[in-house]
Swiss-Prot record:
Its main location: membrane. The gene is GJB6. It comes from Gallus gallus (Chicken). GO terms for cellular component: connexin complex. Exclusively expressed in the cochlea of the inner ear, where it is found in cells of the tegmentum vasculosum, cuboidal cells, supporting cells and clear cells. PROSITE patterns: CONNEXINS_1 (PS00407), CONNEXINS_2 (PS00408). This is Gap junction beta-6 protein.
Length: 263
């Protein structure tokens, strides 16, 4: 799988992320993708070949392996990374759409466009507010959901996070209960616990970032509400002054007309 392309795409999202989001991307790249590519694929590369059962019954070994490992650990982690990274791509698409609209306004010569050239639009960092805030917050929520679902699926599918040394299988077509052995169970257990721990750290970072965004959102709303409370009073004063001026002008005009008619 081409993880470099995924890193390039998510690297663009890093520019528009919060500080916590940048830490999450760092953990994702270094402790998950790099470990998955460099080490985990080698550890699980021989899992089916070195899965040994003490029977010569044709098909028994394959059935037992499928029973204990319906999905390979390495493939499940790769699928998890794809699902967890997909919401961040929504943010990248939203930013690309905003940038495209800015470029279109610039080319049309719109007076509302405050940019000097296309390069300034291309390198602009958008603030997380408005519709981008909703997109970014929804992406974090779905990341949390995907992380939690995959951790539960992992625990449920493999009956825990430890790799047993001995597995007893009695599935058909095995003639009786046979003993099956996994290669490098301790090493695989260490990698499994490490990946689960990193996934838990990512969940905590997502929760912290979600709380941070919600706090900023409500503070911004309360600040706007406070400004709106003071702003109407200011508008009322301005309207009162304007009405007084209009009355003075109206009275002066009436006096002028009366004086003109009387003369």
């Amino acid at each position: 799988m081409d993880w470099g392309a995924l890193q390039t795409i998510l690297g663009g999202v890093n520019k528009h992320s919060t500080s916590i989001g940048k830490i999450w991307l760092t953990v994702l790249f270094i402790f998950r993708i790099m470990i998955l590519v460099v080490a985990a694929e080698r550890v699980w590369g021989d899992e089916q070949d070195d899965f040994i059962c003490n029977t010569l019954q044709p098909g028994c070994k394959n059935v037992c392996y499928d029973h204990f490992f319906p999905i390979s650990h390495i493939r499940l982690w790769a699928l998890q990374l794809i699902f967890v990274s997909t919401p961040a791509l929504l943010v990248a698409m939203h930013v690309a759409y905003r940038r495209h609209e800015k470029k279109r306004q610039f080319r049309k010569g719109d007076q509302k466009c405050e940019y000097k050239d296309i390069e300034e639009i291309r390198t602009q960092r958008f603030r997380i507010e408005g519709t981008l805030w909703w997109t970014y917050t929804c992406s974090i929520f779905f990341r949390l959901v995907f992380e939690a679902v995959f951790m539960y699926a992992f625990y449920f599918m493999y009956d825990g996070f430890r790799m047993p040394r001995l597995m007893k299988c009695s599935a058909w077509p095995c003639p009786n209960t046979v003993d099956c052995f996994v290669s490098r169970p301790t090493e695989k257990t260490v990698f499994t616990i490490f990946m689960i721990a990193v996934s838990s750290i990512c969940i905590l970072l997502n929760v912290a970032e979600l709380c941070y965004l919600l706090t900023k959102f409500f503070l911004r709303r309360s600040r706007k509400a406070g400004n709106q409370k003071h702003h109407p009073n200011h508008e009322n004063k301005e309207e009162t002054k304007q009405n007084e001026m209009n009355e003075l002008i109206s009275d002066s005009c009436q006096n002028t007309v009366i004086g003109f008619t009387s003369s």
